[in-house]
Amino acid sequence: MEKPLFPLVPLHWFGFGYTALVVSGGIVGYVKTGSVPSLAAGLLFGSLAGLGAYQLYQDPRNVWGFLAATSVTFVGVMGMRSYYYGKFMPVGLIAGASLLMAAKVGVRMLMTSD
C-alpha cells in the first residue's frame, strides 16, 4: 500500500486556523489597548495568511504563497517583540503559532519539491 503524500488534516485547515488567530489577536489588541497599529497589522497579515490558505485549498502543491511568507515574517517580528518585552502573552503566543505554521509549511515544501 502506497503512503499518502498529504496528511489526514490538510494544511489549509491549519492555515485558516492560523488566520483566525492572527486576526483575533489584532482585534483583541485594539480592544484592550486601543492600538490601531495592532488592528491594522492583524487584519493585514491575517488577510494575507487567509489568502495563502485559500490558495493552498485550491492547489495543495502551492505552498510557496502568502501563507509561508506571512508565517515566516511573523516568527521574526513577534519573536523580537516577545524578547524585547519579556512576556509570552500575547506576542509570544503568536510567535509560537507562527513558528509552528512556518515549520509545517516548510515540511510541506520539502515534501512537494520536485
Curated annotation (Swiss-Prot):
One of the record's GO cellular component terms: mitochondrial membrane
Organism: Homo sapiens (Human)
InterPro entries: TMEM14, TMEM14_sf
Protein name: Transmembrane protein 14B
Compartments reported by the entry: Membrane
The encoding gene: TMEM14B
Transmembrane domains' residue ranges: 8-28, 34-54, 60-80, 83-103
Family of this protein: Belongs to the TMEM14 family.
Subunit text: Interacts with IQGAP1; this interaction promotes phosphorylation and nuclear translocation of IQGAP1.
Tissue specificity annotation: Mainly expressed in the outer subventricular zone (OSVZ) of the fetal brains.
One Pfam assignment: Tmemb_14
One function term, GO molecular function aspect: identical protein binding
